[in-house]
């Protein structure tokens, strides 16, 4: 699976086995915690798996001491099996996207958008850093990085249909990255 396979949403990653009964510790990559606590279909995929494999969620809970979720999935009965899934991606079909509020976006929809500053193409959204406040990572045509906080005042226009967003950073911010 490519990191941006349009058929799947990455919601978490298995970071460790937990206990002896097949529980997994999962780092959350979703804004929807119910993906880790409400039973239902989930898929796991390791780098060596050609396709995601169905492993329905039986139960899950937040593990505050580590900032992770503990999940129990069908087909993973013990620690030995659980350890084979460390590093795997936890996925749901893209059709399972949960509804967003106005002016909220799925990360995957922002990646690849053209970024315009003062009417000129600045670059392309290449990543999003979750640092308390989301920060757009923009790669310019000469492969330099520009970081701009993803807030309405600095990113007033996001047009998914046109594949573009417009930024209005404070004076000097872009130049500080470009030299």
UniProtKB/Swiss-Prot annotation:
Keywords of this entry: Chaperone, Cytoplasm, Ribosome biogenesis, rRNA processing
Highest taxon above the source species: Bacteria
Organism the protein comes from: Synechococcus sp. (strain JA-2-3B'a(2-13)) (Cyanobacteria bacterium Yellowstone B-Prime)
Record-linked Pfam families: PRC_RimM, RimM
PANTHER family to which the protein is assigned, alphabetical: RIBOSOME MATURATION FACTOR RIMM
Protein name according to UniProt: Ribosome maturation factor RimM
InterPro entries found in the cross-reference section: PRC_barrel-like_sf, PRC_RimM, RimM, RimM_N, RimM_N_sf, Transl_B-barrel_sf
A biological process from GO: rRNA processing
GO molecular function: ribosome binding
Any one Gene Ontology cellular component term annotated for this protein: ribosome
rRNA processing in keyword set: yes
The record's note on its domains: The PRC barrel domain binds ribosomal protein uS19.
SUPFAM superfamilies assigned: PRC-barrel domain, Translation proteins
Function: An accessory protein needed during the final step in the assembly of 30S ribosomal subunit, possibly for assembly of the head region. Essential for efficient processing of 16S rRNA. May be needed both before and after RbfA during the maturation of 16S rRNA. It has affinity for free ribosomal 30S subunits but not for 70S ribosomes.
Gene3D superfamilies per UniProt: PRC-barrel domain, RimM
UniProt keyword rRNA processing present: yes
Subunit description: Binds ribosomal protein uS19.
Location(s) in or outside the cell: Cytoplasm
Protein family membership: Belongs to the RimM family.
Domain called PRC barrel: residue spans: 102-173
């Amino acid at each position: 699976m490519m990191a941006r396979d349009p058929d799947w949403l990455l919601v978490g990653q298995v970071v460790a086995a937990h206990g002896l009964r097949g529980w997994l510790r999962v780092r959350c990559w979703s804004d929807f915690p119910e993906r880790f606590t409400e039973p239902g279909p989930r898929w796991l995929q390791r780098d060596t798996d050609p396709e995601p494999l169905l492993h329905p969620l039986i139960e899950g809970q937040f593990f505050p001491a580590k900032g992770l979720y503990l999940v129990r999935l069908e087909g993973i009965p013990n620690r030995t099996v659980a350890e084979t899934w460390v590093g795997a991606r936890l996925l749901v079909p893209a059709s399972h996207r949960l509804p967003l509020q106005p002016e909220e976006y799925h990360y995957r929809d922002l990646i690849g958008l053209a970024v315009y500053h003062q009417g000129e193409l600045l670059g392309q959204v290449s990543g999003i850093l979750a640092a308390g406040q989301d920060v757009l990572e923009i790669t310019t045509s000469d492969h330099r990085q520009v970081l701009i906080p993803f807030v309405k005042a600095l990113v007033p226009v996001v047009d998914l249909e046109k594949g573009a967003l417009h930024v209005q950073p404070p004076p000097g911010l872009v130049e500080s990255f470009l030299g």
